[in-house]
Amino acid sequence: MILKNKIKTRTEDKSTITDQAEVILAHRYYLKDTDGDVIENSSQLFSRVALAVASIDTQYGKLPVDAQLTEKDFYTIMSNLEFVPNSPTLMNAGTEQGTLSACFVLPLEDSMEGIMKAAHDAAMVQKFGGGTGFALSKLRPKGDRIKSTHGIACGPIEVLKTLSRVSSMITQGGKRDGANMAVMSIYHPDILDFIDCKKVEGEIHNFNISVGVDSNFMKAVEGNMDYNLINPKTNEVAGSLNAREVFDKIVYGAWRNGEPGMIFLDQVNKDNHVKETYGEMIATNPCGEQPLLGNESCNLGSINLAKFYKKAEKAHAFGWKAEIDWARLEWVTRKSVHFLDNVIDANKYATADIEEMTKATRKIGLGIMGFADLLIQMQIPYESQLARDAGSKIMKSVREWADDESKQLAKSRGAFPAWEDSNYDKQTEVYRNHCRLTVAPTGTISMIAVTSSGIEPTFALAWKKQNILEGKTLNYVNKYFEQDARKHGFYSEDLMDYLAEGGSLATVPEVPEWAKAVYATAPEISPDDHVLMQAAFQEACDSGISKTINFPNSATKEDVEDAYMLAWKEGCKGITVYRAGSREKEVLVKGNADKSEQPTLDGFELEEQMLESNHDCQGGCNIVFESGCETCKTCGWSACLIS
């Protein structure tokens, strides 16, 4: 791999990088020579990224000495694990290959040329290391006449299968399989076929699917009313369906195997400030948290909230038993916005159209991770109003600082080029970036930062990791839980074994009630509380949030329906659900205590899946499904490109 800039080695505090993080970095992120041998360490990786991204400052009139100060700040926030950019930036910054962005949406026009261009551009994006989203909503329905050839349209589902086959041929950035999202409007005549297109597990395996709905449809569901289907080619009514029956079909699919998800498009487009000029956002990136216009891309990064815990001498006015280092959080937020804006210019784009559109709106996605770990340190149960209030306050603060920093950048660099065509207030809302915040899945980068993923609760307190080479199986325990268990006298190896086998802390009599509440895991938290937490963060987030609403295996279709309705009423931009054990080909997530609550995968299928997915946990796989994405807690493999 060729470097654009000479790497400068720094001395680092090795304690910030754990052994597990080191394994993940070596396997997935460190540069390697032609023999595949690692040629950098974590300090050099962060130096490489900081130098490449900070050098952009000189394009905006800064002196080299000022760019060096920026480089130092960028290195600091990354090496301290206070901020970590999305995986493509870590992998590719400072090299001659690959993109620095993870999220793309490509236009899919209703013509042979448009479909083939989308397939070509998707291949180029995924070759560069990105994931792609498509809206099928503009494609004419199956069976429509094609005037130019007197033929019959194959329909959106066949186009989707074609895109899936193209994606299967590409390994993203040489490191992972293609990842995609397909969205179809609820008003499309082929919507029923779309809802069922992944009914057979394994079909269209490299696409997530979501149905795009709006409040009119949801109100029709509530009223058990019919609604019209619209042919996108003619804009004429093509039939009608009962909204309740279609909604029930969506719910059944989600209950059956987690798909389709739902995207509330009218809620999404409330934050589309260039709608009058560029149209509506009707698709998202593969994990669903980043709505984009056709040919837009977005680079993401996440602040590690667990790093901002600060002990307090007395209870905070909010009722918290600890404090947050707000001053440091503001500083890191501002540096992160600066970093992400620079990435837009440091980036290498797969097509000229993507570069043009991305630089027109200059969207960035600053998010968070480590929220559950912060709550644990503050002794606040995730399943509480206090936790939701904390999340809301944090997100509103980050939004305020991110908005202001984007305004400051606009003063020195100019507003995003499409700003003149936007509905932003021309006196008070002069932004460098069309949107600023996105809560992405952080499966792998949160493992590098040794923290919880996104805004998800802790998935497990203990889990088993097999070391095939040494023939050992070891328990890995959440560090905060182990500290508290030892401090308060309820630690035992038997308890750790029990939890690693899938047992619940709630059933252990000797564990105090406060610990059971603070350390409740994702499968134990009610679906309503999952949704309400997502909504608490969504209020201040101008893009979307990737989060999984966890259900036990025993959940009913009515339970899933309630979650979908609650997400809509609470103002979420989308929803993804997962019922434990609802997919045939899954790996064990937490021991063996209750098989009915655990997905399973036999050894042969597991080995085959991991090889196909560039998985390298040597048989000690530990997959969790969170933030709408499968991630291995052992080796850092993730199905999501952002992670």
Annotate the PLM regions.
Residues 1, 588-620, 624-626, 631, ...:
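Acidic, low-complexity intrinsically disordered tails
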Residues 1-98, 106, 247-256, 577-582, ...:
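Acidic/polar, glycine-rich intrinsically disordered N-terminal extensions of enzymes
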Residues 17-25, 76-92, 186, 335-346, ...:
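Core structural elements
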Residues 54-96, 100-104, 109-111, 232-239, ...:
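Gly/Pro-rich turn-and-neighbor structural signature
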Residues 141-180, 310-344, 348, 469-511, ...:
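A structural-propensity feature for long, helix-poor, extended segments
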